[in-house]
Amino acid sequence: MKIGLSKSIINHAGFVYDAVDQGWYNTLKGHNLFFIPNTLNQDFNVMANDLDSLILTGGEYAEQRSEVEQALVNKMTEHNKPVVGIAESAFYIAGLLGGELEYIEKHFDINHPIFYHREVLEVNSHHDKCIKSLPNSANVLCLDYLGNVEAFTHGNLAGIVWNPEKMEKPWIPPEIAYMLRI
């Protein structure tokens, strides 16, 4: 599978870099990875046609990155291909669907339990937001201990609020792994 991965924008020593967490190499082992440049000067239609799926990786908000991701998400949905948002990008996908987001306290740089069907799993949290609700048409897969949405699908769109690439044993809900064909 050819999986597109968006990249964070890092400012360091007066220079601007695109970057991706190296944990994705292990998480997506055996797949062809294509890293999306943070520039609008590219053909998103051709890119969407070439990719099998797209992962919007986590990371801090940057306007340029956001514009690139929006352009590619639009083309991926036109091509009926899966798009999965991770962490901050899960909030973006939830917002597209009309989900309700809120700030949450004591949820930054911690591990916490989530509920997947009848299983309790531990995941990480590197954010101070939560998804309070999604439209009824969304399929909620995981909830945290406060009842906030931690993973969901909606057609070819999905979100995972934690960072699977930062886990010792990366875990992606099977429904989303199936969408990505991983």
Predicted regions mapped to residue ranges:
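N-terminal beta1-alpha1 cap of cysteine-dependent amidohydrolase-like domains
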Residues: 1-88, 95-102, 107-120, 128, ...
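Catalytic His-Asp charge-relay segment
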Residues: 157-160
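A recurrent flexible, glycine/aromatic-enriched loop bordering the glycosyltransferase active site
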Residues: 123
